[in-house]
């Protein structure tokens, strides 16, 4: 609009006669309220969705709900900001209007100028008012220019203030095909209900046509047939076993049934004692048995019936840690000084095992180098010893005593020349007796290694060392 073509009376009149800044202020307040409401709604919406997704509602459906609600929360926050901007622009328009209203010439001044001009023109008979008329017209022109400039400034400011950012529609947070799917499901359910009603109607019709009157007759016939069968079986048993056969047969089975009833009562009566005995067996632990004192290994490796001073403690051994005499592995006690060899066979050359204690050989197996005699076979029938896991025991095998003593040095020298002649056997306590029985029938020199738990034990074969 070209405000330069419009006289100041109209321009000023429109500014003074218009609604003023009231509507723009009301619009600014409304935009402010909308912005605050949208912001509050967005915060509440986000809080509710977050609380449901993290506490009361978990799983894939909860994640889908949160993902669908997030764009709507974003839209509300953005729209709230736009509403706040619109309120600010409305207030800017109010400021522009107030500025333009103050800049335009008030209509009373314009009316006074026009009245003065009319008066001067009416009294200008001789031209004496020509200067006054020109001054009045000049003043009017200034008013026109002032109103024109004020309106152009107001138009520019109001155009900027009224240029708002376009609002967008809220995003779609639901499935558009949900209504169609719901309608289809409703139709399917209706059809299924119709089919069910049809089936129910058909069954009701068939039930109405069924002849229920014949059921009592059928039941009565079955009862009669059962009675006739019982009578027939009774007559047959009486014909085979005599006139009281059926009664005896019936009493027999009644007695058997009563016996089973008594067994049930007995089971019920014994359930409590059985429970107590079961609990006693499960939780009762026997008191620890006293340990049998055992003498040391060196003090009791002789015969249990007289050569030993008592039960020997379990012997322990280490693999690959024995002393060596040349290539021969020997017990650790062989390294100590020993007395001269005195053979048991020389002491009692013609006696048996019962006379072995009379030789006064110490209980220690290594005392007086009896082991040397046993190694050479000179002990004969005295007492070749074997060793079990709990101690030492011996039994004698018959044989002929050696004709002459055998020196220990000669036996050791012979074993050094033939280190491979000694056969080693590994066995546990349970299989020791069986192994010794088998080795007693095999010639050669055998070394039996007995294992008991983590500590292996060594036992000599159940024969004379000189022959097996």
Curated annotation (Swiss-Prot):
GO terms for biological process: response to host immune response. SUPFAM superfamilies: PE/PPE dimer-like. InterPro entries: PPE_C (IPR022171), PPE_dom (IPR000030), PPE_sf (IPR038332). Disulfide bonds: none annotated. It comes from the Bacteria. Pfam families: PPE (PF00823), PPE-SVP (PF12484). Residues 447-468 are annotated as: Disordered. Belongs to the mycobacterial PPE family. PANTHER family: GLUTAMINE-RICH PROTEIN 2 (PTHR46766:SF1). This is Uncharacterized PPE family protein PPE33. It comes from Mycobacterium tuberculosis (strain CDC 1551 / Oshkosh). The gene is PPE33.
């Amino acid at each position: 609009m070209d405000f330069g073509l419009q006289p100041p009376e109209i321009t000023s009149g429109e500014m003074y006669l218009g609604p003023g800044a009231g509507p723009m202020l009301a619009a600014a307040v409304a935009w402010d309220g909308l912005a605050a409401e949208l912001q509050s709604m967005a915060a509440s919406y986000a809080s509710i969705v977050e609380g449901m997704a993290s506490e009361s509602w978990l799983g894939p459906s909860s994640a889908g709900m949160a993902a669908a609600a997030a764009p709507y929360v974003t839209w509300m926050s953005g729209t709230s900001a736009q509403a706040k901007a619109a309120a600010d622009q409305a207030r800017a328009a109010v400021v522009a209007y107030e500025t333009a209203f103050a800049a335009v010439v008030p209509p009373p001044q314009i009316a006074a100028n026009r009245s003065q001009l009319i008066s001067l023109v009416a009294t200008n008979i001789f031209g004496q008012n020509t200067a006054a008329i020109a001054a009045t017209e000049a003043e009017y022109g200034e008013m026109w220019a002032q109103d024109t400039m004020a309106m152009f400034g107001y138009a520019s400011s109001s155009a900027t203030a009224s240029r708002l950012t376009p609002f967008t529609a809220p995003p779609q947070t639901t499935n558009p095909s949900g209504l169609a799917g719901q309608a289809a499901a409703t139709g399917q359910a209706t059809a299924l209900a119709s089919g069910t009603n049809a089936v129910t109607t058909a069954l009701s019709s068939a039930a109405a046509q069924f002849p229920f009157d014949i059921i009592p007759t059928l039941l009565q016939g079955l009862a009669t047939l059962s009675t006739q069968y019982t009578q027939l079986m009774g007559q047959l048993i009486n014909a085979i076993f005599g006139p009281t056969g059926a009664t005896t047969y019936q009493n027999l089975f009644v007695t058997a049934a009563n016996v089973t009833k008594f067994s049930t009562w007995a089971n019920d009566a014994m359930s409590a004692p059985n429970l107590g005995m079961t609990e006693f067996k499960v939780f009762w632990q026997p008191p620890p048995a006293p340990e049998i004192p055992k003498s040391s290994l060196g003090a009791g490796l002789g015969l249990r019936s007289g050569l030993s001073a008592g039960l020997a403690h379990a012997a322990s051994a280490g693999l690959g840690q024995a002393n060596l005499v040349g290539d021969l592995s020997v017990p650790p006690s062989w390294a100590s000084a020993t007395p001269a060899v005195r053979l048991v066979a020389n002491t009692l050359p013609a006696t048996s095992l019962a006379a072995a204690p009379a030789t006064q050989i110490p209980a220690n197996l290594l005392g007086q180098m009896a082991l040397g005699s046993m190694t050479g076979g000179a002990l004969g029938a005295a007492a070749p010893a074997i060793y079990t896991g709990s101690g030492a025991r011996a039994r004698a095998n018959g044989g002929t005593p050696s004709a002459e003593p055998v020196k220990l040095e000669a036996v050791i020298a012979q074993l050094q020349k033939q280190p491979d002649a000694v056969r080693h056997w590994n066995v546990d306590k349970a299989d020791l007796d069986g192994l010794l029985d088998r080795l007693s029938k095999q010639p050669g020199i055998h070394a039996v290694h007995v294992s008991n738990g983590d500590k292996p034990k060594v036992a000599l074969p159940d024969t004379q060392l000189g022959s097996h």
